[in-house]
């Protein structure tokens, strides 16, 4: 791994800043689709993009599961001086992701309508959701490989290069979205196609790095290593769940909103889900930017350094969470108006109100995500998975069921804050137990 060696803090910043930017860019892919679809098609089409988000976040979560698990092992091998083993694990990861991507594409295309219905598409929304998902599915392989390559380039010691590549893809996506949706009027198909083509273009840049003379990590002859696959999945499970949590949250919220409030509130939640994704992915950027460094020093058996990196990560998450809440609270009206026209005055007022409730959960989310990432980095996969499952599934579902049963549908918007609070108690307890051991 290429480190500058000036100080631990400088290396920390050098890794997390590009990682956070990369997470923003990945989040903006779908958000940009939503903005152009809302402006160029309709609010119903925007809701269809939101309905489809669990699928796209599912693709990214698979990518992150394997990418983080793979980069953890690669970083440990590099720290131990085992470059050949690092290359073999990297190569195996790419082959497995290609096979998995093809299977996902085939299954989604065969069961396209039932899948869209399962995600929550009503008769009104189904045509748009079917088009969006059906266009994204053939690009599954580039979606999944894109983030995996981005993570491995950072592990290779080139975080700035990874940021340049992923930002180039985002710029291309914006340009293609504008041309296909606003100029050529290709609707949700145009938005989905623009995203897929942009991801494919970035893959070519990543391959140029791994096949070129710069990198330490290279393709090698494929060897099937089942034990390393299991180790990789265990290490990456927490990060994969963290990424998929935004999709899980969207799915459960969509179902609850349709049941307790009404279809109109789906538009409000679509806007909230974009904001939530950006903030949670920012926290994941801190965790994943720190991860290669923690794993590297863990492999070198230098606990004082990787414990200090955890402190840096927690401080960054706390500061980022407070900043996110302040920005979103003050700028709630401007955020909502990115998606809604002034003629939708009552919907704008409602969306601003519920957004300001939802964002309170950000104050705790970052701490949970960073602690989960730390446990992944030191190969305590069970702890990391417990944290991710609690915040994204167990505590959230219990909160949704309890709040709606006792206080009614509008209490839905408080569920994330309750879930994050419960999870933080668990996270702190696990860390205290691990530290004493």
Report each predicted region and the residues it spans:
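Membrane-helix interface/capping residues of multi-pass secondary transporters
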Residues: 34, 43-46, 83, 112, ...
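Transmembrane helix-bundle signature of multi-pass secondary active exporters and lipid flippases
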Residues: 20-72, 136-143, 230, 234-297, ...
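Hydrophobic transmembrane alpha-helices of multi-pass small-molecule transporters
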Residues: 58-61, 105, 173-178, 203-207, ...
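Hydrophobic/aromatic residues in alpha-helical transmembrane segments
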Residues: 17, 33, 70, 111-112, ...
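Short alpha-helical transmembrane segments in multi-pass integral membrane proteins
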Residues: 1-19, 74-141, 183-237, 294-360, ...
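Helix-loop interface residues and adjacent transmembrane-helix termini in multi-pass membrane transporters
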Residues: 28-31, 40-43, 77-80, 155-156, ...
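Short runs within selected transmembrane alpha-helices of multi-pass transporters and secretion channels
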Residues: 67, 135-154, 162-173, 191-204, ...
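Small-residue-rich hydrophobic transmembrane alpha-helices
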Residues: 46-106, 143-162, 268-332, 365-387
